């Protein structure tokens, strides 16, 4: 069988995963050097589609990354105004006084958010900086150079049958390489 010909894309930086960490990395790198070409691969059909969790969000990292996030129509707008910590037994619950709680369990001043909405917003912010985001493309294989250094990823082949044989609509995955 002949070697499959694959399209190759080259970037300065390739990031796998458009979650909070991947998108924040892309944003920070683009802020540091606007000339960098940055690609983010996301396996879901759209950014945020595989992040189903809610979150109590402390904004310190976001304050450093995007200092004016409050003026940018971010999805972070429901602040924690009260909180209770309960201890449960088999038959009842008891409220634990807040002064017994360590500071890491206190969330007053933090925000209640949807991580999915945060990722969508960060994705739009990153794209506005010039980051290229490819939703619907899962990285399926690492690419190595002759010294066994990772130089990129290959996206999954599309149009395969249940036995992983090419169908009429077969499209080979793309090799996406980065300098970093």
Give the positions of each predicted feature:
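Short, well-ordered amphipathic alpha-helices
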Residues: 22-30, 62-66, 153-162
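N-terminal mitochondrial targeting presequence
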Residues: 1-2
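N-terminal FAD cofactor-binding segment of flavoenzymes
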Residues: 43-92
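N-terminal Rossmann-like FAD-binding beta1-loop-alpha1 element of flavoenzymes
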Residues: 11-39
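Short, flexible hinge/linker loops that cap or flank conserved catalytic cores
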Residues: 5-7, 174-175
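Extended hydrophobic secondary-structure segments that form protein cores and membrane-embedded regions
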Residues: 38-44, 178-180
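Feature captures the FAD/FMN-dependent oxidoreductase FAD-binding
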Residues: 76-79, 84-180
């Amino acid at each position: 069988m002949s070697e499959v010909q694959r399209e190759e894309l080259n970037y300065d930086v390739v990031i796998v995963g458009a979650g909070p960490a991947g998108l924040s990395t892309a944003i920070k790198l683009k802020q540091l050097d606007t000339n960098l070409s940055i690609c983010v691969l996301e396996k879901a059909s759209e950014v945020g589609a595989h992040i189903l969790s809610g979150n109590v969000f402390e904004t310190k990292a976001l304050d450093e990354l995007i200092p004016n996030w409050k003026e940018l129509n971010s999805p972070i707008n429901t602040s924690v105004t009260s909180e209770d910590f309960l201890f449960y037994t088999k038959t009842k619950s008891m409220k634990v006084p807040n002064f017994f709680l360590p500071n890491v369990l206190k969330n007053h001043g933090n925000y209640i958010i949807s991580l999915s909405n945060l990722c969508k917003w960060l994705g739009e912010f990153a794209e506005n900086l010039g980051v290229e985001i490819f939703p619907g493309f899962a990285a399926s294989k690492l690419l190595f150079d002759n010294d066994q250094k990772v130089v990129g990823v290959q996206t999954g082949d599309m149009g395969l049958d249940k036995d992983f044989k090419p169908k009429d609509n077969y499209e080979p995955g793309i090799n996406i390489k980065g300098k970093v």
